[in-house]
UniProtKB/Swiss-Prot annotation:
Isoform 2 interacts with the sarcomeric proteins, MRLC2, MYOM1 and ENO3. The lineage of its organism: Eukaryota, Metazoa, Chordata, Craniata, Vertebrata. Isoform 1 is only expressed in the brain. Isoform 2 is ubiquitously detected with highest expression in skeletal muscle and detected in myocardial myofibrils. This is Probable thioesterase PNKD. Probable thioesterase that may play a role in cellular detoxification processes; it likely acts on a yet-unknown alpha-hydroxythioester substrate. In vitro, it is able to catalyze the hydrolysis of S-D-lactoyl-glutathione to form glutathione and D-lactic acid at very low rate, though this reaction is not physiologically relevant in vivo. Belongs to the metallo-beta-lactamase superfamily. Glyoxalase II family. Gene3D superfamilies: Ribonuclease Z/Hydroxyacylglutathione hydrolase-like. Zn(2+) 1 binds at H172, H174, H229, D253. Binds 2 Zn(2+) ions per subunit. Induction: By Hepatitis C virus core protein. It comes from Homo sapiens (Human). Residues 32-58 are annotated as: Disordered.
Length: 385
């Protein structure tokens, strides 16, 4: 019955995803009594022994468009619900993890750590385009992992650095950011798992609210609530003052180099407010995003602002990096202000080109939110060259 429901929900929304889901369902049916799989789903729905999940929040927006590509790229509301609220999402993540490990045995990109007066930030390429991070106090030899979706890759980096993992910071619940929580927290028994209690983070031990601070050695990391991609999405700001270096923003799926995340669980006003939260940070703040999307995002930025010279210079640099499979993070918030269209909704040129004009009461935030929604719609239909 589950296979029929899932196949019906996905009808017309991408044959490839339907085939993947049917394969997962078939495998799951054959192994449905597996003890290990069902135990792995703490904080998420499982096929038995759990109450039925509540309906999706009415704030969750999914608006099919009349032309162009489906903005959720054949994911759809039904698949999103399955991915985030049932055990099928975990099985899908495990399948993607195996494929990525086979395709990119050394990671999808070549990355370099950044060292600042005894604090090291180490990007770890995982899955097909994700980044996890280790934040290390090199004097105390203590480490914090951000979004450790591939526990094997993160553990290898921990062992190579010779550090003790004491905390995991999860930006949000999606499996490509939280999938390694179980294995790492079991391996490192004193490791704490931080995240939003609103998001159903797997193996969460220490819930965080807006402006809460996590202290590890000299590391002072502040959680900032940034809902929109998910209801409980958090970003993490490493304070640069204790080590006399730049602050670092670990942005998950809120903000990318020249892009921002999809609004799965909110609306344009919510996402605009979250983006404005990080816009209030200093220009020298380093941006460490959750995905390697730079080249595609800059290509879209060139469509909406073709005469933006800052974007053109950054695109040339990114293309040189990607020719050698080098990662493109970090950028700075100062750079992002100059070319990221999702941070430029206040710019008159963009408003005149794409915006709907002022709101019914002349509210500037209304027109900026409408412009952000239009940018998101255009980006979802954009095909990078």
């Amino acid at each position: 019955m589950a296979a029929v429901v899932a196949a019906t929900a996905l009808k017309g929304r991408g044959a490839r995803n339907a085939r993947v889901l049917r394969g997962i369902l078939a495998g799951a049916t054959a192994n449905k009594a597996s003890h290990n799989r069902t135990r792995a789903l703490q904080s998420h729905s499982s096929p038995e022994g759990k109450e039925e999940p509540e309906p999706l929040s009415p704030e969750l927006e999914y608006i099919p468009r009349k032309r162009g590509k489906n903005p959720m790229k054949a994911v759809g509301l039904a698949w999103y619900s399955l991915y985030t609220r049932t055990w099928l999402g975990y099985l899908f993540y495990r399948q993607q993890l195996r494929r990525a490990r086979n395709r990119y045995p050394k990671g999808h990109s070549k990355t370099q750590p950044r060292l600042f007066n005894g604090v090291k930030v180490l990007p770890i390429p995982v899955l097909s385009d994700n980044y996890s991070y280790l934040i290390i106090d090199t004097q105390a030899q203590l480490a914090v992992a951000v979004d450790p979706s591939d526990p094997r890759a993160v553990q290898a980096s921990i062992e190579k650095e010779g550090v003790t993992l004491v905390a995991i910071l999860c930006t949000h619940k999606h499996w490509d950011h939280s999938g390694g929580n179980r294995d790492l927290s079991r391996r490192h028994r004193d490791c704490r798992v931080y995240g939003s209690p609103q998001d159903g983070i797997p193996y969460l031990t220490h819930p965080l609210c807006h402006q809460d601070v996590v202290s590890v050695g000299r590391l002072q990391i502040r959680a900032l609530a940034t809902p929109g991609h998910t209801q409980g999405h958090l970003v993490y700001l490493l304070d640069g003052e204790p080590y006399k270096g730049p602050s670092c923003l670990f942005s998950g799926d809120l903000l990318f180099l020249s892009g921002c995340g999809r609004t799965f669980e909110g609306n344009a006003e919510t996402m605009l407010s979250s983006l404005d939260t990080v816009l209030g940070l200093g220009d020298d703040t380093l941006l460490w995003p959750g995905h390697e999307y730079a080249e595609e995002n800059l290509g879209f930025a060139g469509v909406v602002e073709p005469e933006n010279l800052a974007r053109e210079r950054k695109m040339q640099w990114v293309q040189r990096q990607r020719l050698e499979r080098k990662g493109t993070c970090p950028s700075t918030l100062g750079e992002e202000r100059s070319y990221n269209p999702f941070l430029r909704t206040h710019c008159l040129a963009l408003q005149e080109a794409l915006g709907p004009g002022p709101g019914p009461t002349g509210d500037d935030d209304y027109s900026r939110a409408q412009l952000l929604e239009e940018l998101r719609r255009l980006k979802d239909m954009h095909k990078s060259k």
